[in-house]
């Protein structure tokens, strides 16, 4: 059994694979000051709830954009599973060709997303990941990663309004009843949710214009469904795209 772990700034996504089948998955809050033993206890509880026997785990693939946790999860895999985890980065063989100025700066999650989308949909393809930041990644028909964009995440945008505007407050991130709101809550929801859909439409349109063709737009991340419901720019939502990408990378690099 393969364990895939995507460590983001806000959440950690964990998936257990039996072959190509995702048999269990979890999402927990990222606590960057936790130690390996603390995460071990958390994993043990999750495995109990999911009916997963840790003795069956014989491989682990990890993407991490939180440097303090890289060593902790490596230690966890050594101690708990007796495996040497595959820590994904731009040097990990994936079959993708990086046509950007500094490939080493690419987050491992973006690499996993790009490979999974390219394998599933071919290219060109645009990948959107809605996380702490929202990332856009573009892969060509020949498997070249040619770049993308990074925008402030939806949560960051909403929090900035709450923290920096004295008379505004936190609101639930849901679709407002209509675009033209009639109270402050609906005003903010319209600006954040529908405004973000407009941001997606604008960047996708510009990227496809540079590519010279339309192409699939694949979205993943916690708020992908919310934004996809508000725009036709997103072709499909793949909730487990990053975990699937980690599985694919692991299979490519198995000894």
Swiss-Prot record:
Catalytic activity from the UniProt record: (R)-pantothenate + ATP = (R)-4'-phosphopantothenate + ADP + H(+)
Binding site for ATP: 6-13, 132
One MF term in the entry's GO annotations: ATP binding
Compartments where found: Cytoplasm
GO biological process: coenzyme A biosynthetic process
UniProt entry keywords in alphabetical sequence: ATP-binding, Coenzyme A biosynthesis, Cytoplasm, Kinase, Nucleotide-binding, Potassium, Transferase
Its EC number(s): 2.7.1.33
InterPro entries found in the cross-reference section: ATPase_NBD, Type_III_PanK
Major localization class: cytoplasm
Cofactor(s) of this protein: NH4(+); K(+)
SUPFAM superfamilies for this protein: Actin-like ATPase domain
Recorded GO CC terms: cytoplasm
Broad EC category: transferase
Active site: 109 (proton acceptor)
One Pfam family this sequence matches: Pan_kinase
Cofactor note: A monovalent cation. Ammonium or potassium.
Any coiled-coil regions, as ranges: none
NCBIfam families, alphabetized: baf (TIGR00671), PRK13318.1-6 (NF009848), PRK13321.1 (NF009855)
Function description: Catalyzes the phosphorylation of pantothenate (Pan), the first step in CoA biosynthesis.
Name of the featured protein: Type III pantothenate kinase
């Amino acid at each position: 059994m393969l364990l895939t772990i995507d460590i983001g700034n806000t959440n950690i996504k964990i998936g257990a694979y039996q072959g190509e089948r995702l048999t269990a998955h979890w999402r927990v809050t990222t606590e960057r000051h936790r130690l390996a033993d603390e995460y071990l206890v958390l994993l043990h509880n999750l495995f109990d709830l999911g009916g997963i026997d840790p003795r069956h785990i014989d491989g682990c693939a990890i993407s991490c954009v939180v440097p303090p946790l890289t060593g902790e999860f490596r230690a966890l895999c050594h101690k708990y599973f007796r495996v040497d985890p595959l820590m994904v980065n731009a040097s990990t063989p994936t079959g993708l060709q990086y046509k950007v100025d500094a490939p080493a700066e690419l987050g491992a999650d973006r690499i996993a997303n790009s490979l999974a989308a390219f394998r599933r949909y071919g290219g060109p393809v645009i990948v959107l990941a809605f996380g702490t930041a929202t990332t856009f990644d573009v892969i060509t028909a020949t498997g070249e990663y040619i770049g993308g964009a990074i925008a402030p995440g939806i949560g960051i945008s909403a929090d900035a309004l709450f923290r920096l505007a004295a008379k505004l407050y936190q609101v639930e991130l849901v679709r407002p009843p209509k675009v033209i709101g009639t109270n402050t809550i609906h005003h903010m929801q319209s600006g954040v949710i529908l405004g973000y859909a407009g941001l997606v439409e604008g960047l996708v349109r510009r990227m496809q214009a540079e590519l010279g063709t339309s192409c699939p737009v694949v979205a993943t991340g916690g708020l992908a469904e919310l934004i996809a419901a508000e725009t036709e720019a997103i072709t499909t939502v793949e909730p487990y795209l990053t975990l699937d990408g980690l599985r694919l990378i692991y299979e490519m690099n198995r000894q």
